[in-house]
């Protein structure tokens, strides 16, 4: 971006100053009613905001019942957001989110931060939609009715165990609101990962947000329950349990993770101290908590890292020992810098030392303006009106301490200037609120504790301070009231947490005659390339000890090789450690990859650096859940995998290596050419030749499902695809950036039958990309094939894109008249009963067979067909929610038309009595009992090997479902090899 800065005489207030002084607040905005949130707590109520008045009429230091935005920071309402297509195929598909948020761990789980400039522009209070999000798995889906009945259990070493609803909390204890800054311990982590990759993903400098949290003091709840025999001393060490002595308070949330629920703990003596400000909160900025931020109830611990603040809070236990939850030990630690990432993975003793745990935040600051890659046009020198450039940013610290000093250096730390500091939270000391209908007490006048960030600013003369002094870097550091400061040198650690070295922005003279200045931040959040640290790495320099400009080496910054090696991972080629040497020459064809490209199929394969890997064996153990693997099935996952995973994870990939993906020739294999005349009297498809087609229409079935229609050679041409078989679709497109032709190929089962002429319809789930920030690439670019099809303008064909079809392929075929060709040896059998079990998009191959059978029964135009008893068909179809059921109406129409010969049973895994009161079918998962109740019994064992059973089961769905179905069918007596077809 390019801006022109103002002169000192006309300098206007910047966005970061909104709410920073007594006259800089807008009275135009007010918080949205909590009724507008997607889910509400039992007593929705918006804060009352007074109409504009003159500031002179408002008495400071006098408690009031109203929130007055004339003198207090404007409360930001959650901005208009909706569920995103990038979440459509994840368990979080129902959550409304802001498309501007930068995703740090691919599509799922949702870990994100706002673009730094967007965050800073919002001022002191951050709207919920731009609040950073840290989640370890699926977000619990809590309905309003469930929230009204939500119970917080308080138990353990207490005189009185209780279960409290949110209504109970409001009635039993005083309501309190505090302005609190939340910070992820990984804030600014990517800077450490640019030195040596640690165990965590790439947070930028916007893993911080501030809001008004409303709830009750944790101390009030503990006083009510009365801890037994409390031990408040620091001796013995906190990792030593003293039986029967209440010493720790353990918190547990509702989120289910691979290694148990998320939980952590606080020392009892801290939890009993109201000065610590620990809240059990239900509100944020006058609204209910959003799902991503813990709806309906969470713990908030001012001055500590976000990892101590349990969301979706269900349980509080007073205990004689600290939390025993997995992530209480294996996360949120700053290990000694000598411990490499690999050591941290393999040497467990490091994680259990209480001296390495992170509680309080450390002092930190960042430059938010100028933004990364921002360009300032340099004005002609003027003595009367110098061109001024405001340097601005945030600073914070922990433990209730206050930032006392922010300093700026324009010469890499040789000299420093103090910036002015604005403390918006002090307005809640000058204008306290008591007895507010929503906030209760919002009054900092009785405490010196500081729980919020502050903003700093220093105006510099562009000519005198930047140009004349040939400034190469701008640095910022902050000091708190304990004189703790930000160090010059990075303290690298295996978790890459609590990074707080100087925040440096490189300065570049550009343009004709150097009439422009461009600013370069150290990194960009997530997987986005850019920043001076990456540039130094690529130049062979060490960004841990950066040198800006000429002759800027500082001897005291240097270190010996042994010290540096102890803090960095060994320089190894990550590509080499991911490859099994015995399979390095094994060639995997594009067709093989395409056959395993269904994210809900039994064996999802993916590509990293041109090699193919089978993710099946790691679906159950993947820390981010199996969705993270399924979402890249059949795709090139290089960017996401390399950016997120540690060297140890890259080594693990070798166990799943299959071989090298075949290279695609620049010229296409044999396909329809200009010189070839297509015989329209023959079927369109050819198993040995690609046939050119075009996309002629797209029918939207759901937010992430489409029926794509492809034209054949003529309106009367037959497709030539037997029922139950698949077709290859290949798309060639020209890369606008490189000019090269790229190819994507997938196998699909058609939605339309072979009787349809002139067209081929395919029902496809579209994998949409995650959204990018203004200058960053998306964490997930979407399904290559599905996004190519989605973006095609059917009304305006492009010469840069071609679509081709080839087929058929597959081992199962319905021949008609109750005849099926399948194994063994493509033998033909007559079937009388079919059990069809599908999950999600696995209904597609099931549908093609069902539709063909139904068409035969319902076709009255062919009286010569032999009269056969209709095939008896049972369908069990599993989905997450009712909205996820594909072709539901079509299934119902066939059920009615087939008059008792088709039975359909739907099973919803996310169906509960509260949100699906009218649902009359199955709930939960497809179990053996479901199969026993809603399918026919298995066929009798044939008298000889040559005799073929007349009953088959057809199965297609995600691997967990297929595994459960396999086990269930086997338990019920089905022969999986002879009688069960897995598509």
UniProtKB/Swiss-Prot annotation:
- Tell me the keywords, alphabetical order: FAD, Flavoprotein, Heme, Iron, Metal-binding, Molybdenum, NADP, Nitrate assimilation, Oxidoreductase
Which residues are recorded as binding FAD? Answer: 746-749, 763-768, 780, 784-786, 841, 844
Q: Which reaction does it catalyse?
A: nitrite + NADP(+) + H2O = nitrate + NADPH + H(+)
Q: What induces it?
A: Its expression is highly regulated and responds rapidly to nitrate induction and to ammonium ion repression.
**NADP: is it a keyword of this entry?**
yes
Q: Signal sequence: where? A: none
Entries under CDD domains matching the protein: cyt_b5_reduct_like (cd06183)
Supply the EC number(s): 1.7.1.3
A Gene Ontology molecular function term for this protein is: molybdopterin cofactor binding
Specify which residues bind heme according to the UniProt entry for this protein: 622, 645
Task: Describe, as the record does, how this protein assembles with itself and its partners.
Answer: Homodimer.
Q: PANTHER family of this UniProt entry? A: SULFITE OXIDASE, MITOCHONDRIAL, SULFITE REDUCTASE
Similarity comment: family membership: Belongs to the nitrate reductase family.
Protein name as catalogued: Nitrate reductase [NADPH]
Q: Which gene encodes it?
A: NAR1
